[in-house]
């Protein structure tokens, strides 16, 4: 028989920072005719929430995050996610994918409209290099090697 654990006693022994406040955010981003955008909506030491927009045809290259889990939820458009072995998942509005740390992936905006995604990241340990290519070397997100292209906004058009 397992001993009973008194949750209240366990919680009393934990220190709580009473100064911590919630962070409110809104899912809004300008749509793009070219390139990509990436904005942090809220974050803590362990988690980040970002909204990403990729113009039609926008993409990145196969990479992994050695210390960070990622979850993507498609808000608008179509995303084609590909893995290290060539496996493919086509995701549309309100569908998502969880990519554990170390999982290689890439994605592209596959539909006729810009791709808008919510990205939630979680990591316990901070590493000097947070994104690596297939060769195991650093692959900065905003680099030509990662097919980065600055976003060109479509005047007056937003996802919200």
Feature annotation, model-predicted:
Residues 62-63, 81-82, 99, 105-111, ...:
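Short beta-strand His + acidic residue motifs that chelate non-heme Fe in jelly-roll/DSBH
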Residues 53-55, 64-81, 120-123:
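Short, conserved beta-strand element in jelly-roll/cupin
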Residues 71, 98, 113-131:
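A short hydrophobic beta-strand segment most commonly corresponding to one strand
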Residues 37-47, 56-71, 85, 93:
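A short beta-loop-beta micro-motif enriched in histidine and acidic residues
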Residues 1-48, 61-62, 132-160:
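A short, N-terminal "cap"/entry segment at the start of jelly-roll beta-barrel domains
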Residues 93, 108-109, 129-130:
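Short glycine-/acidic-enriched loop or helix-start segments at secondary-structure transitions
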